[in-house]
C-alpha cells in the first residue's frame, strides 16, 4: 500500500480503504464474531502469554464500563513488572510508532489502559476487573476464514423485500417497493 509503516500509508488510497473496510467488517459476522474470547483480565493475560506457543495472534478489544467507548489494540508481548503487575505490550494505531502498555494486576484481577477512540480525542483511562467483562480477544485466524453472509441465505430483509419512501423536491412522496 505504499508505506513501510502504518503511519506512512496514504489514508486516501482507495485500495487501502477497501482493505481497512474489509477487516473492520469481519468483526460483525461469523466466524469472527462468534470466535471472540471474553474473559477476566488474568484469563486474557494468560492467553496473550501463550501467543508464541500456540501460533495464534489476536486483537484486544477494550471497552469502557458504561459502554460509551471502545477500541482495538494489537498485543505482541508481555512484561512482568513485579509485585503481580504485568504489562501487555501493544500496538495502538492511535499512537503510531509507540509501544504502549495495557496493565494487568494479578493481585486483584484488574486492568487499565490509557486510550482514545481516535487520535483527535483526548485520551481517557479505560479500566476493568473480573466482573466487568471489558476486555476481549479476537483471534486473527477467525478473520482469515470465509466470513458468513447474514443475508445471503434468504433469511434477511432481502428475502421479504422492503419499502423505501422519500420526499420529492415538490413535497410529494416517491415510493419504491
For the regions a protein language model found, what residue spans apply to each?
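Cysteine-nucleophile protease catalytic domains, especially the papain-like/related folds used
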Residues: 1-42
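Glutamate identity and glutamate-enriched acidic tracts
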Residues: 8, 14, 19, 43-46, ...
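Cys-His-centered catalytic/binding microenvironment captured across papain-like cysteine peptidases
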Residues: 67-70, 79-177
Amino acid at each position: 500500500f505504499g508505506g513501510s509503516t502504518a503511519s506512512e500509508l496514504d489514508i486516501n488510497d482507495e485500495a487501502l480503504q477497501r482493505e481497512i473496510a474489509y477487516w473492520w467488517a469481519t468483526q460483525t459476522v461469523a466466524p469472527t464474531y462468534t470466535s471472540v474470547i471474553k474473559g477476566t483480565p488474568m484469563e486474557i493475560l494468560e492467553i496473550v502469554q501463550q501467543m508464541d506457543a500456540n501460533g495464534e495472534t489476536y486483537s484486544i478489544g477494550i471497552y469502557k464500563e458504561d459502554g460509551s467507548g471502545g477500541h482495538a489494540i494489537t498485543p505482541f508481548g508481555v512484561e512482568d513488572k513485579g509485585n503481580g503487575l504485568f504489562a501487555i505490550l501493544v500496538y495502538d494505531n492511535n499512537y503510531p510508532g509507540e509501544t504502549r502498555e495495557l496493565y494487568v494486576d494479578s493481585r486483584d484481577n484488574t486492568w487499565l489502559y490509557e486510550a482514545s477512540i481516535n487520535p483527535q480525542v483526548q485520551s481517557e483511562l479505560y479500566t476493568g476487573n473480573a466482573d466487568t467483562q471489558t476486555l476481549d480477544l479476537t483471534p486473527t485466524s477467525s478473520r482469515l476464514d470465509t466470513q458468513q453472509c447474514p443475508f445471503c441465505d434468504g433469511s434477511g430483509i432481502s428475502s421479504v423485500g422492503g419499502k423505501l419512501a422519500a420526499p420529492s423536491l415538490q413535497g410529494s412522496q416517491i415510493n419504491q417497493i
